[in-house]
Amino acid sequence: MLKEIYKVLKDIKIDSSNIVELGWVSEVFFENEKLKIFLRIPKEYINYSNEISNVIKTALKEKMNLEKIEIIVKEKFEKDQKVEQKNIFNPQRIEGIKKIIGIASGKGGVGKSTIAVNLAVRLAQKNYKVGFFDADVYGPSAGTLLNIKGQVLKISQDNKFIPVENYGIKIVSFSSLLDEGVPVIWRGTMFHKVFSDLFFNTLWGNLDYLIIDFPPGTGDAQISTCQLVKLDGIIIITTPQKISLDDVRRTINAFKKLEVRIIGIVENMSYIIDTCGKRIDIFGKDGGKILSEEFNIPLICQIPLDVEFLELADNGIPFVVNKPKNNSQIEIIKAFDRICEFI
């Protein structure tokens, strides 16, 4: 539903852009069966707020048959933006969910999302009830990795999100909310509201684990989540290269400031196993070990690089659903079992 609403809002043109890309749409959510839209309009356009509101209501009525719409308009002041960003740090448990685990990395390209997806599916294979929250607004990958492209989040009769399901897990991803390839320009308050709706107004049911796949680094997605949800811990994904350690250090220190426990470090693409069974460190070595010793955080496992691991991910098939065919793949399965033990 939200995906279609934003599509309509993008058609509301202002000069050569639209109200979404201009950052005027602050919040969009349902409350008591009424659609509420909060707009932040710059001073030079504030006198046209009634006209803009009427255009929005007409468009939503004609294209989506929405009748109950309330539009709240405020002038966009710099001081308002500063106040809005001061969200109260009071994380809560999500009803029915026993453990909430975040998967994070210092930079992109380390296989974080692939590990998060396979961990979730591996837990489900062990008969745990599992949910998966793809928190990467700018580059959601669950659509591809979990083969749910084109599936949108549906809304229940009591205005709750219904997760998409595949591979035995319940999935909420921005790939099921936003159009593919459309840039997202959100400020902290928008993140906070949308994340709050998705975390607390989704029909998760009773879960043993909710796995959250964070975007790389430390930004609004991580901050909003830690302000809203009481996490049981974070797993940090890195690679053996020492050149990437500074990014990981920043990520670890950021989560410590947010008072979130670091469960351990997973070193991905650590080595390859050749046809003779010999280990070859093609991307360097000891990156995860250095971090483990520096921060006194467990190095949970080292995951070898395997071509089929990557190929299956590109085709929407989690690696753990297949039987291992060689020593490298056996070690990968063992690594995910090791992570399951840690959480």
Language-model-derived ranges and their functions:
Residues 9, 25, 97, 108, ...:
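Residue-level signature of catalytic and energy-coupling elements of molecular machines
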Residues 1-28:
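N-proximal, solvent-exposed amphipathic alpha-helical segments enriched in charged/polar residues
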Residues 11, 49, 53-56, 208-209, ...:
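Conserved catalytic-core segment of NTP-binding enzymes
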Residues 99-138, 252:
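Walker A/P-loop phosphate-binding motif and the immediately C-terminal alpha-helix
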Residues 123-186, 192-195, 199:
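Phosphate-binding loop that captures ATP/GTP phosphates
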Residues 21-24, 31, 41-45, 49-104:
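Extreme N-terminal, non-catalytic leader segments
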Residues 315-325:
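C-terminal boundary of histidine-terminating zinc-finger modules
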Residues 178-225:
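Phosphate-binding/switch loop-helix module in NTP-utilizing enzymes
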